[in-house]
Amino acid sequence: MGILEKISEIEKEIARTQKNKATEYHLGLLKAKLAKYRAQLLEPSKSSSSKGEGFDVMKSGDARVALIGFPSVGKSTFLSLMTSTASEAASYEFTTLTCIPGVIEYKGANIQLLDLPGIIEGAAQGKGRGRQVIAVARTADVVIMMLDATKGEVQRSLLEKELESVGIRLNKHKPNIYFKPKKGGGISFNSTVTLTQCSEKLVQLILHEYKIFNAEVLFREDCSPDEFIDVIVGNRVYMPCLYVYNKIDQISMEEVDRLARKPDSVVISCGMKLNLDYLLEMLWEYLALTCIYTKKRGQRPDFTDAIILRKGASVEHVCHRIHRSLASQFKYALVWGTSTKYSPQRVGLTHTMEHEDVIQIVKK
């Protein structure tokens, strides 16, 4: 029996098993086996030597955004509107066959936008260009899931299921579980909270399925067996996702209002160029970027060339971005902006910078 058949059998078994206290260990084991087989399926096959055109895209700019969606939902049109890149757009499926990068210039930052080939159902099993598409999607900072507003719910649940099965967790945080395999001493299990979904016995069963008999496990939050399996496997990617409903000009106002109120969702129309500016604002928020401007002594700040860093970056991060040896020569910095009590304020390396702050670094 091949891996796909085994996965199918386990999925059927999970679907027909009632969820209750008596079956929780059985379900936990099935989920562990399922995660194991899916991980095997995603390992690159040794026989495939051809890399495939247009997939080894070099990361450039200050952030990377992956544009994911079914064929013909408007991804190529969106890329053409947002960037200067022309991605072939047509009203038939599979127009985009390779990964097309473009750059959005927004608030002084260069954001790389990747138009990935339309994901089809079964991409996790390597159908279409699925496996390559997913490999590129895992390197992104944010995912924009482009959906057709006329059939958005069906597309959304299918795509979420596909991405979930390849280890991409959307709008979730990493489970707060400490896990460390050891050479001996058996399994040490502790928790700092009351567990309602996992027990010590279930944790041991899951670990034994992965041939782990000696480990230290500490639950710092109430997690499900699935989340514990994610911690064991370790190759999961947790990233923010914006659900973008395109073609809202083809649905009723009531439906537009319902979709717009959903969490992490934006409604747009590429054809009529509606709400694209709001989408950019939301994208900036999800990327959590900060622009920092530099100033030389006795000169005006340079507002043409910003340093782009993650929100919460410190003066030390700014030093490393300018030059790797600058932090070791650092004496103090003068900062103008919202992060200071008064301008300019003399600060040290640990001072947290805010958006559009101006900094002047003084060396020893």
UniProtKB/Swiss-Prot annotation:
- OBG-type G domain residues are 63-288
- MF-aspect GO terms: GTP binding; GTPase activity; metal ion binding
Q: Which cofactor does it need?
A: Mg(2+)
What SUPFAM superfamilies is this protein classified in? P-loop containing nucleoside triphosphate hydrolases, TGS-like
What Gene Ontology cellular-component terms does the record carry?
cytoplasm; nucleus
Q: Name one GO biological process term.
A: cytoplasmic translation
Does the entry feature the keyword Nucleus, yes or no? Answer: yes
Q: Which EC numbers characterise this protein's activity in its record? A: 3.6.5.-
Task: Note the superkingdom of the native organism.
Answer: Eukaryota
On modification after translation, the UniProt record reads: Polyubiquitinated.
Which PANTHER family did the record assign?
A: DEVELOPMENTALLY-REGULATED GTP-BINDING PROTEIN 2
- How is this protein named in the record? Developmentally-regulated GTP-binding protein 2
Q: Which organism is it from?
A: Bos taurus
Lineage at the top is: Eukaryota, Metazoa, Chordata, Craniata, Vertebrata
